[in-house]
Amino acid sequence: MAAVDDATGLEAARKQKIHNLKLKTACLENEELVQELHVSDWSETQRQKLRGAHLKAEELVAAVDVGTKWNLTEVYDLAKLMRVCGLEMSQRELYRPEDKAQFMDIIAMKKVLQDLRQNRNKTRVVSFTQMIDNAIAKVEKVEEDVRRSQLDATQLAQVPTQTLKQVEDIMNVTQIQNALASTDDQIKTQLAHVEKTNEIQNVAMHDGEMQVAEEQMWTKVQLQERLIDLIQDKFRLISKCEEENQAFSKIHEVQKQANQETSQMKDAKRRLKQRCETDLKHIHDAIQKADLEDAEATKRHAANKEKSDRYIRENEDRQEETWNKIQDLERQLQKLGTERFDEVKRRIEEIDREEKRRVEYSQFLEVASQHKKLLELTVYNCDLAIRCTGLVEELVSEGCAAVKARHDKTSQDLAALRLDVHKEHLEYFRMLYLTLGSLIYKKEKRMEEIDRNIRTTHIQLEFCVETFDPNAKKHADMKKELYRLRQGVEEELAMLKEKQAKALEEFKESEEVSGRCWHRVQPPCDENNEEVLTRRSKMVEYRSHLTKQEEVKIAAEREEIKRALTAQLWCRWRAGPHRKQHCTHASNSVAAIIM
């Protein structure tokens, strides 16, 4: 298509050139005829012919003024415009009216935001509703601006991709309150069972049903161990939620990267806009300069034309005068004819130059206007791109701020919840540790009692063996039964101590937290030791009270035996000397027994 246009332009220029040449030839031929008439015979007819030729010359000169045209095809093009005006921007770097805007990625981003608006977690803890609505409004504004431009928004649409992904991920994070609801219900159920077990144990101990009380204590230990397991489950759930939430701690890096991308895009468009504005200024300056030159040239040509017309008129007037002096002024007439020929020739050349200049000026204005439109369109698109990029940057900033708020709030809630769970762990560990401590104390006392019974049974067995007492079999069976019972109690005691050590090991983390947060909390170990010492002190008081009563009875019995023995010895002493030695031996034996 461009080749056809060039061929058509060249053909038109060729025809116009032929036409101009014909006009010049006709005018010059007529001037030559004028010169020939100057040297011909001087007659009235010749003079009339000369006048007619002058009239025709005026018409031909007027035709040259009106009919001379120039079609320039290569005088002014874009390369010459850029060279003359010192332009930087080539057409490859400029937006064109036929360029189509690329905004499908913007529509896809709006679709992502609309999907996020339907997310079930968008109003939890930190609301995302307002942020998403603002983002959709900004994206719609960007889409509207891009549709009215020739911009390619593909790269711009990629900027908030990571931010929107972070928003979607944090909206889908597990809600810790819902995750812990089932565990809290199980803890409440276990606490209710523990309370019921305590009631049954208290009733059994009040009624003296020690076996039932011991079974209830074992049941309570199992329930409290289950409470510890549930607490550990809560810790695991909290840790899992913390791990999910930790992924959003570096949201500032996402925002920083997005800001860098938008800054680069803005800087690129600003540089492009600045270059276009610089070229526009150069074109405006060139147009103003061309306008001044055109005005000066037009004024100069008009002055030359007026001068030429005046000169031709004067020439004709002088020719008329010369006709009256034909004989005297022949040489002058010929000279004037020659001068006229030269002037007409010079004028034709001046007309050619002026018309050529006008065409060049017109072409310059046309090329400059087209390039000016492209530059102005590019500046417009740069402004739109900068505004759209700013809107996307605001979108990214608001999204990152919402993600950070959600992350900070979730971290605070998890920290507070972890502290509450540590409090629950302390309470349930205290219950379990005190229960195990009470059982261990009772089992140890039971062990001591069995050991005393074993020693007593062993002594009784030795007495029976010494005298071949048939009850020896009974004491031997009882001793075996006591050893079997002792082994069972020892295994239970070892199991209880193992449970106590395991619970203490699992309590270390909560113990550290309680040491940092609750300085006045009494450790369950110290509380258990105090209860054991209190229990032992109470038992010692009971034993001391019983021992005092036994000592009084024994002392009274010993006093009675002593009095009876004294009376008997007195009687034997009086019975005769042969019994003195026997009485002395008996007295020593009885004294030893009494002691």
UniProtKB/Swiss-Prot annotation:
Keyword terms, alphabetized: Calmodulin-binding, Cell projection, Cilium, Cytoplasm, Cytoskeleton, Flagellum
Keyword Cytoplasm annotated: yes
Region of interest (Disordered), ranges: 294-317
GO MF annotation: an example: calmodulin binding
Keyword rRNA processing: no
Subcellular location: Cell projection, Cilium, Flagellum; Cytoplasm, Cytoskeleton
GO CC field: cytoplasm; cytoskeleton; motile cilium
Source species, domain of life: Eukaryota
Residue numbers spanned by region Calmodulin-binding: 317-337
Pfam families: Flagellar_rod
Transmembrane segments: none
Miscellaneous comment as given in the Swiss-Prot or TrEMBL entry: Coded by two tandemly repeated genes with almost identical ORF: PFRC and PFRD.
Job of this protein: Major component of the paraflagellar rod (PFR). The PFR is a highly ordered lattices of fibrous proteins that are located inside the flagellum and assume a fixed orientation with respect to the microtubular axoneme.
PANTHER family: 69 KDA PARAFLAGELLAR ROD PROTEIN-RELATED, 73 KDA PARAFLAGELLAR ROD PROTEIN
Subunit structure: Heterodimer of a 69 kDa and a 73 kDa protein.
Protein name in UniProt: 73 kDa paraflagellar rod protein
